[in-house]
From Swiss-Prot:
<protein>
    <recommendedName>
        <fullName>Putative septation protein SpoVG</fullName>
    </recommendedName>
</protein>
<dbReference type="GO" id="GO:0000917">
    <property type="term" value="P:division septum assembly"/>
</dbReference>
<dbReference type="Pfam" id="PF04026">
    <property type="entry name" value="SpoVG"/>
</dbReference>
<dbReference type="InterPro" id="IPR007170">
    <property type="entry name" value="SpoVG"/>
</dbReference>
<dbReference type="GO" id="GO:0030435">
    <property type="term" value="P:sporulation resulting in formation of a cellular spore"/>
</dbReference>
<comment type="function">
    <text>Could be involved in septation.</text>
</comment>
<keyword id="KW-0132">Cell division</keyword>
<comment type="similarity">
    <text>Belongs to the SpoVG family.</text>
</comment>
<keyword id="KW-0717">Septation</keyword>
<dbReference type="InterPro" id="IPR036751">
    <property type="entry name" value="SpoVG_sf"/>
</dbReference>
<keyword id="KW-0131">Cell cycle</keyword>
């Protein structure tokens, strides 16, 4: 399964959530609402989730192995950095 498109839909400068992203796989399947989060050890992605009646958050969709997660995170963070640079250029 190949990542064929990454769209940064919303950028935030303040707070820990830095962006909301949609990723398309094989030009056939899209996952919306992946979040770019700033943590203690740098940026990471959080998959879309829902809150259970018990107050826990459960992922709706997620990679099932670390190689796929790393590939997905790398692609998303690369596009996030590009979007940040473009936004900064528009502000100048």
């Amino acid at each position: 399964m190949e990542i064929t498109d990454v769209r940064v839909r919303k950028l935030n400068e303040e707070g820990k959530m830095k962006a909301v992203v949609s990723v398309t796989f094989d030009n056939e399947f899209v996952v919306h609402d992946i979040k770019v989060i700033e943590g203690q050890n740098g940026l990471f992605i959080a998959m879309p989730s829902r809150k259970t009646p018990e107050g826990e958050f459960k992922d709706i969709a997620h990679p099932i192995n670390s190689d796929t997660r790393n590939k997905l995170q790398s692609a998303i963070l690369k596009e996030y950095e590009k979007a940040k640079e473009q936004e900064a250029a528009h502000k100048e």
